[in-house]
Amino acid sequence: MTLAPADLPVSLQPLVDRALARLAQVLTEPIPADLLPLLTRLAVASDFALDTLVRQPALLAQLAAPGCPPIPAPVLDPLQPSDWPAQLRRWRAAMSTRLIWRDLAGLDDVAQTLAGATTLAEDCLRLALEALQQEFAQRHGVIADDQGTPQQLVVFGLGKLGGGELNFSSDIDLVYAYPHGGESDGPRALAAEEYFARLGQRLAKLLDETTVDGFSHRVDLRLRPFGSAGRVALSFAAMDQYFQREGRDWERYAWLKARAVAGDIAAGEAWLQTLRPFVYRRYLDFTALDGLREMKAAITAEVARRELHEDIKRGAGGIREIEFLCQALQLIRGGREPALRERRLLVALDALVAAGQIAPEDGSALREAYLFLRRLENRLQMLRDAQTHVLPSDALDRERIAVGLGYADWNVLRAALAEQQQRVSTEFAALLAPRKGQAAPDALANYWRSLPEGSNAPLLAEAGFLDANGADQSLRDFAQGTGVKSLSDAARARLDRVLPALLHAATRSPQPDAALKRVLGLLQAVLRRTSYLALLDEQPSALARLVDVLARSALLAERLAAYPLLLDELLDVRVSGPMPDAAGMLAECQQVLAVEDPESALRWLNETRLALSFRMAMATLDGRQGAVDSTRQLAELAQAVVVTVLAMAEADMHAAHGGIPGGRFAIIGYGSLGGLELGFGSDLDLVFLHDNPAGVDASDGARPLEPGRWYARLAQKVMALLGAVTAAGRLYDIDVRLRPDGGKGSLVSSLASYTEYQRERAWTWEHQALVRARGVAGDASLLADFEQVRAQTLGRERDTGVLYADVLKMRGRMRTELDRSDAARLDLKQGAGGVVDLEFLLQTGVLARSAQHAALLQPRDTPSLIDALAVAGFLPDATAQALHGAHATLLDVGLACTLDRRPRLAPTTPAIEEACAAITAACRAAELPFA
């Protein structure tokens, strides 16, 4: 807006004339003509700014300087404490006027004005605290910790101060703390509690007290533990105890934005990290909505009681609703998604959009509304430096606000405000509304509430349960179990809403009885975790999705019951989106390497693996991808985990024993891991290699180990980490029997001994296994050396007669010992024409032809091996196409069996018969009559 004196509404002209006349009286020079437009806008927008210029005439030249630079901060003389209040207040008034000037001149947008107000408050806090600390040190001494380091007060800023988005005339929410107890060492010694409490009270008074120069900042200390009844300053230990025992839901919202703003900032930020589990729960936490409902109800009651309907902060569609909406979504998901742990609202809003929790168009609307409301809020407060959020009732004030913001009149501004408030109200109501969509009590709900005394098998039969008596008994047993009986009233109310809805969903599933059994198993597991009951209560769509998954997959039902954190995945928008690629999965896994606590890091890695494999299972179950893709992804995930675990183990070894200078270590994946065809729950076939440089006989740490022991210890650590049981389960079972000499051989083979073994002593079946082997983790140069050894081993000339005889003998032995097929069912893996027949065919082709066709040495996975053998002429093109289809069919059926916890013994169907026939025909054509 460009408002020149000639553009003023007639009604505002007298006000501006009086303002400019007042200013002219105190200036030694006439008002420069080029400043008149901006001073006109200032006169319309702010009595406070004009009053400040009248009191500090020299300020005008500073504001008019190019770029409107900051006003130098005052120096608070320790010898003149009586001057401090005036110095702080005059500087704050000057800097606040500068904020108004920059806003009106278009130098700052809304976000910059909020940041400027925050910085000003922090600077005033810092100046005041530093001066008071010197005074206290002279009078009372200092309080040192056990190492003799002086302690400082820690000042936490909450609310908008913590978020860096302070409005123009806001109070500042402060909480005082200190690291440790103790006593000061001065002539008038004080205990730490008294020392820091007095210091904090003096700080608040120095900033807050109104004098002839006004005030610096209004200080609110009521957000401290126990509120106004609590101690003014608490030790970190006392703060910890409070939040462990007394912390309430609304305090999670308050401390979400907390930031150390003065004093010992480093200590404060370190302590805030310890508070993070209180603010952000480890799992999706829909109980946060309960706290939000309580706070919103209290605010609504206050608005009604105090007739604050014109309040743009607390009223409907106001600033507070945007803040609550973002903070609630942050609290729900921030424990799982670090990107959401953000103090700044606009940054948090962007993160919520990026995480899929707010639609992009809704995020844009909320951003626009927030900036609109904050700009209006600032202008209301700039008028007279008043902490107000209420629209003015005075006609002249209304016109000043509207014209100052660039609107033709108040009605136009009011209409724009109403539009923004409606947007906010709609979004906020949607957040709190989901449970209202659940059906009113019906027959199934009344039946559940009658248990365990009641019984109504006919009702369950009518609802669709085949074994109605069994379902009735299961529900009665569940209702009278200690888990249900020990629920709090609030949790029981949630269960009473959730369980009937689950029953309805079960009756609509293809297998109602199985769904009910699995639902009750899951509920039994989560009864003590009210956050999961809250999730199902607040999110009916998740409830329906849950029952659908439980009905179709016994494996996922077991995993959900064992690890309820997977319920989070049902609400994750990514569960229906594309899977991350191998690099993306590695990046997700390696986030744990930044966690200092090894136990927490391992648990997080387990949770990451669980979540990613769950998403793969869901994609497979829903038919969004075939088993070939899923098994490849599972192998890539396993490799990412192994790489991460190796890094953890190496860090542990280096910390304890140092490293082997110039030494190399690598992990080779065999079997399904090497062949990129891993199943759900498959173990990992691993072989460990090392290469130790000549002349190095020990590690270089404080507790050195000779190289052989060092590498063995490293491999053992890798295996221990992969197999360790955590709250999120274990990563993988490990099989190391494919190493040279099997169980009798060394756990870690040197590259030289491995090379010699493959050249001189390995059996044919071991060379078959080598076809799918590939390096998965460790030193890149050693992995390259392994590839060379593998190529030399597989690519040598062979006696095909001996090769075929060995392969047929081994396959016959396996068929006899492992095939579980019967007259009606086929063992998908070991049966005639099954997966192993196909693997043996391909492995034989590689061993027989790679001496002449080096390209056969590159692929490891079945589809690529089929293609390569077709190019090499080992398989006709038509046969290769048939084998691709057969492989996909058997893998799809096998993975479906795994997902439903059925053995991979499948009733023969036309598709399975066709697949087996194709594999059997290909084997016979290659002179490998396995069947």
Curated annotation (Swiss-Prot):
Enzyme Commission designation: 2.7.7.89, 2.7.7.42
Catalytic activity: [glutamine synthetase]-O(4)-(5'-adenylyl)-L-tyrosine + phosphate = [glutamine synthetase]-L-tyrosine + ADP; [glutamine synthetase]-L-tyrosine + ATP = [glutamine synthetase]-O(4)-(5'-adenylyl)-L-tyrosine + diphosphate
EC main group: transferase
Keywords tagged on the record: ATP-binding, Magnesium, Multifunctional enzyme, Nucleotide-binding, Nucleotidyltransferase, Transferase
Keyword Nucleotidyltransferase: yes
Cofactor: Mg(2+)
A Gene Ontology cellular-component term: cytosol
Protein's UniProt keywords contain Magnesium: yes
GO biological process, one term: regulation of glutamine family amino acid metabolic process
Sequence segments annotated as region (Adenylyl transferase): 441-931
A GO molecular-function annotation: ATP binding
InterPro entries tied to this protein: GlnE (IPR023057), GlnE_rpt_dom (IPR005190), NT_sf (IPR043519), PII_UdlTrfase/GS_AdlTrfase (IPR013546)
CDD domains referenced in this protein's UniProt entry, alphabetically: NT_GlnE_GlnD_like
Region (Adenylyl removase): 1-434
Functional note: Involved in the regulation of glutamine synthetase GlnA, a key enzyme in the process to assimilate ammonia. When cellular nitrogen levels are high, the C-terminal adenylyl transferase (AT) inactivates GlnA by covalent transfer of an adenylyl group from ATP to specific tyrosine residue of GlnA, thus reducing its activity. Conversely, when nitrogen levels are low, the N-terminal adenylyl removase (AR) activates GlnA by removing the adenylyl group by phosphorolysis, increasing its activity.
Record-linked PANTHER family: BIFUNCTIONAL GLUTAMINE SYNTHETASE ADENYLYLTRANSFERASE_ADENYLYL-REMOVING ENZYME (PTHR30621:SF0), GLUTAMINE SYNTHETASE ADENYLYLTRANSFERASE (PTHR30621)
Family the entry assigns: Belongs to the GlnE family.
UniProt xrefs under HAMAP family: GlnE
Protein name, per record: Bifunctional glutamine synthetase adenylyltransferase/adenylyl-removing enzyme
Gene name as annotated: glnE
